[in-house]
Design a protein with these regions (language model features):
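RNase H-like DDE catalytic core and adjacent DNA/metal-binding regions
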Residues: 1-201
Length: 201
């Protein structure tokens, strides 16, 4: 059953109040990318069994942190922040932040290389998949079909590690969307946007 708006709002409130010192630290950062990736210090995605709920709660938490950080918007109450309807842009940002948070932990060596901080031989994953940053600094694969007319999300899927909760939620969501079709169909749909390493044991 899909989570209700009140359930999502309550979850967002709980995530915010459980780590007030971390919220304060993120609020005072000047780097928006630090604010976004730092969301992992405020939230634990293992609390969520539903991908949509994870993205919505993350969107509300990001909105709340931004409003705290922006001195001119501090007059807006926390209730207004959590009850105002989320936009497509909010959810797109939430999706990207969740993905980049997982990538930052799983692919630290690859990120260091892509940032130009390492001049040695590229890590195996960089060489194997032709990894690069997109405009949101999300890691994508160049793939073998990069010259086709397919959408970028299919030509250059986002790289995710196996055995991570976010990866599991993504596969589960695709499986449900495919009306519980077999593994092959589920993975085919997942790979329209994501490439999950060793997604079949």
């Amino acid at each position: 059953m899909a989570p209700t708006s009140s359930t999502v709002n309550e979850s967002a409130s709980l995530e915010l109040v459980k780590s007030p010192h971390i919220v304060h630290s993120l609020m005072n950062t000047e780097d928006r990318s630090t604010l976004n990736v730092g969301i992992a210090k405020v939230m634990d995605c293992y609390h969520f069994s539903n991908l949509n709920c994870l993205f919505r709660v993350t969107a509300y938490v990001l909105r709340f942190l931004r409003n705290l950080k922006n001195r001119e918007r501090r007059v807006q109450s926390s209730t207004e922040v959590l009850t105002k309807e989320l936009t497509a842009m909010d959810l797109t940002e939430s999706d990207a932040v969740c993905v980049k948070t997982v990538q930052a932990v799983a692919f630290a060596k690859e990120i260091q290389y892509l940032n130009g901080r390492q001049q040695s031989t590229p890590p195996a994953l960089v060489a194997q998949f032709g990894l690069f940053f997109d405009e949101r600094r999300t890691i994508r694969c160049k793939g073998r079909i990069s010259e086709t007319t397919l959408l970028q999300s299919t030509k250059n899927p986002i790289l995710l590690p196996s055995k991570r909760h976010l990866s599991d939620l993504l596969i589960r969501e695709r499986h449900q969307r495919m009306n519980h079709s077999g593994v092959r169909h589920t993975l085919a749909m997942t790979r329209e946007r994501f490439w999950i390493l060793r997604d079949v044991a």
